C-alpha cells in the first residue's frame, strides 16, 4: 500500500488532493478511532491538520504500514514554477522538524519514477527537479519522500500544476511499480547545491538511483566529518546504499566514508557501470584495473545476467589471485595471454604461441585477459583513435585505457576467440588507412609502406628544404637539370607486430592477408 499524507494547513497539498479526486474515484472509510480516510487501488490517503514536517510516525496514521509514504506538499523559494521531490532529514540542527543528525528512510526508486513522470506531465511553464535532503519528519516508519508543487501562492493554487503532480503520483501503483522493485544500484550523495544538479543528472542519464543528498550547506551545518561519523553512516544506511559520490573536493569526508566500508566513486564510475551487473563490474575491475584508473566496460559486459549464472570466472596467468567467483579472477598456467607491454615493433615473429582459440577452449573460465602489444596500439591509436575505441567497446567485456580514458592500451578481457578475430580484422582496416600493404600470418601483422628516405635524397644531391618536402609528398623535382622522381628517394618501411593465433594449431603459416599495391626500391 502507498500512503499519501495531505495537510489541510498546506494550500498546495489540498490542491494536489483535489486533482487526485478529479482523476480517480476514491472510497471513503472510517477507522476504529472514527477518523476518515480514503482508498483507491493501492493508495490510502490521510489528511492531517499540522504541517507535514511535523508529522513524525506518519506510518501509524494508516490502516496497515505502507510500503512507502508520499507527503503532498508545497515548495517555497525563488525558483519559479517547479515540481520537485526530495527526502527528509537533518545533517545538522533540526530547525524545521525532525531530529538533528537523523534521517527518514529514503525510497530512491520512487523518486526516479516521479522525476520521469514530472517530465511527461509538467505544464510547459514548470521546471522539474529534485532537492537535497532537508527538514523533518525524520521518524516516519516507512520509506518516504516529499512530492512538491511550487514555488509561490500562484502555483500552490494552480490546478494544472497540481494535476501533473497527481498524475505522477498515480504512476507509483501497479505490479511493476517501483515500490515492488529492489535495486542494488543506489548511491548516496554528498556536496553540491540545494537543487543537486549532478545527482539529478545521474538519475536521468544512468541506471543508478540516488538516496539522501547532503548539500554543501547541510554538510557545513553538520561540522567536521570525523566528529560526525554516526550522522554520515546514518545517511548511508537510510539510503540503503553501499556506494557514495562526493561531488566536491572533501578529502576528510571521503576518508570517513571509505573507513565505513562504503565505496566512494566518481560520476564516471556510475556512467561506465550503467547496464552492467554489480558482480560483473567487480570481476572486471579485479581482473584488470579499477574504472577510476582507466578501465572501460564494453557492450558485451551488459549481456551478462547474474541471475542465470552462479559465478563468472576470468582467467589471467599474470595475476597472483587464485580465487574463483563472480568477483575474482582465476589463475591458470594453461593460458598464454601473450601479454607484453614492451614488444619490439620490428620483431618478425612472436616469441610464444598466442593460439587463443585453443587457450580459451582449455580455460576453466568464462573469459580471459589478453593484450595486444603496446607498439601496435600506439600505431593504431595514432591513425584513428575514435574507431579504435569503438572497436574495443563493441567486442570486449572490458579494456584498459590511458590519457583520461581516450587511448586503449591493448589489454582487454574477452569471452571468445571470435571477439579477438573481430578486433584483429578491425585493426587491419585501420592499418590500411596508413600502410600500402597489410599482411597477416597466423601470429603476426606485417605492414609495409613507401616512405621518404632523406639519406637517398642526399646521395642524389637533393638540397634540404622545399625539394625534400615535394619529394616526400610524391612529386618529382629537378636538381642541376636532372629530374628526380619520388620513387628514387623512397624506401619500403616494414613493421611486424605479434598478434593472437586463432587457428587449431600454433603454426605460422599464412592465414590471411590484406594489401594494396606498393612500390619499393
UniProtKB/Swiss-Prot annotation:
UniProt-listed Pfam families: tRNA_deacylase
Cofactor annotation remark: Binds 2 Zn(2+) ions per subunit.
Renumbered residue ranges of the record's region Disordered: 323-353, 499-521
Obligatory cofactor(s): Zn(2+)
Keywords of this entry: Hydrolase, Metal-binding, Zinc
Matching InterPro entries: Deacylase_DtdA_archaea (IPR018033), DtdA (IPR007508)
Name of the featured protein: D-aminoacyl-tRNA deacylase
Species annotation: Haloquadratum walsbyi (strain DSM 16790 / HBSQ001)
Amino acid at each position: 500500500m502507498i500512503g499519501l499524507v495531505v495537510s489541510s494547513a498546506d494550500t498546495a497539498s489540498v490542491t494536489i488532493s483535489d486533482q487526485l479526486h478529479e482523476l480517480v474515484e476514491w472510497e471513503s472509510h472510517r477507522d476504529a478511532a472514527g477518523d476518515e480516510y480514503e482508498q483507491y487501488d493501492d493508495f490510502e490517503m490521510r489528511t492531517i491538520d499540522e504541517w507535514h514536517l511535523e508529522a513524525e510516525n506518519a506510518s501509524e496514521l494508516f490502516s496497515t504500514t505502507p510500503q512507502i509514504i508520499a507527503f503532498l506538499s508545497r515548495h517555497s523559494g525563488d525558483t519559479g514554477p517547479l515540481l520537485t521531490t526530495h527526502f527528509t532529514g537533518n545533517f545538522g540542527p533540526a530547525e524545521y522538524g525532525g531530529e538533528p543528525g537523523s534521517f527518514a528512510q529514503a525510497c530512491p526508486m520512487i523518486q526516479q519514477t516521479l522525476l520521469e513522470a514530472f517530465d511527461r506531465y509538467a505544464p510547459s511553464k514548470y521546471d522539474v527537479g529534485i532537492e537535497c535532503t532537508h527538514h523533518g519528519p525524520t521518524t516516519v516508519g516507512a520509506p518516504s519522500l516529499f512530492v512538491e508543487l511550487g514555488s509561490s501562492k500562484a502555483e500552490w493554487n494552480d490546478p494544472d500544476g497540481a494535476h501533473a503532480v497527481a498524475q505522477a503520483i498515480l504512476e507509483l501503483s501497479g505490479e511493476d511499480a517501483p515500490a515492488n522493485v529492489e535495486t542494488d544500484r543506489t548511491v548516496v550523495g554528498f556536496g553540491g547545491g540545494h537543487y543537486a544538479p549532478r545527482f539529478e543528472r545521474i538519475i536521468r542519464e544512468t541506471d543508478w538511483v540516488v538516496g539522501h543528498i547532503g548539500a554543501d550547506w547541510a554538510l557545513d551545518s553538520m561540522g567536521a566529518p570525523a566528529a560526525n561519523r554516526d550522522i554520515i553512516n546514518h545517511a548511508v544506511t537510510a539510503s540503503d546504499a553501499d556506494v557514495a559520490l562526493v561531488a566536491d573536493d572533501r578529502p576528510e569526508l571521503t576518508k570517513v566514508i571509505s573507513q565505513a566500508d562504503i565505496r566512494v566513486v566518481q560520476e564516471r564510475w556510475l556512467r561506465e557501470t550503467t547496464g552492467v551487473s554489480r558482480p560483473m563490474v567487480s570481476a572486471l575491475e579485479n581482473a584488470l584495473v579499477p574504472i577510476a584508473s582507466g578501465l572501460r566496460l564494453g557492450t558485451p559486459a551488459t549481456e551478462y545476467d547474474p541471475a542465470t549464472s552462479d559465478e563468472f570466472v576470468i582467467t589471467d596467468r599474470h595475476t597472483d589471485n587464485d580465487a574463483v567467483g563472480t568477483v575474482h579472477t582465476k589463475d591458470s598456467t594453461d593460458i598464454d595471454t601473450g601479454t607484453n607491454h614492451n614488444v619490439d615493433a620490428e620483431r618478425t615473429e612472436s616469441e610464444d604461441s598466442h593460439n587463443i582459440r585453443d587457450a580459451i577452449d582449455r580455460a576453466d573460465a568464462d573469459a580471459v585477459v589478453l593484450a595486444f602489444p603496446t607498439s601496435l596500439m600506439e600505431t593504431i591509436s595514432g591513425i584513428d583513435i575514435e574507431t579504435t575505441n569503438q572497436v574495443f567497446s563493441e567486442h570486449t567485456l572490458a579494456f584498459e585505457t590511458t590519457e583520461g580514458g581516450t587511448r586503449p592500451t591493448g589489454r582487454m578481457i574477452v569471452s571468445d576467440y571470435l571477439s579477438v578475430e573481430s578486433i584483429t580484422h578491425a585493426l587491419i582496416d585501420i592499418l590500411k588507412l596508413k600502410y600500402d600493404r597489410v599482411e597477416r600470418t597466423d601470429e603476426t601483422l606485417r605492414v609495409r609502406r613507401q616512405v621518404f628516405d632523406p639519406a637517398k635524397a642526399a646521395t642524389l644531391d637533393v638540397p634540404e628544404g622545399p625539394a625534400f618536402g615535394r619529394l616526400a609528398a610524391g612529386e618529382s623535382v629537378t636538381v642541376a637539370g636532372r629530374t628526380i622522381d619520388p620513387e628514387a628517394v623512397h624506401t619500403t618501411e616494414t613493421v611486424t607486430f605479434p598478434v593472437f593465433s586463432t587457428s587449431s594449431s600454433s603454426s605460422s603459416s599464412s592465414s590471411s592477408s590484406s594489401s594494396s599495391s606498393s612500390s619499393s626500391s
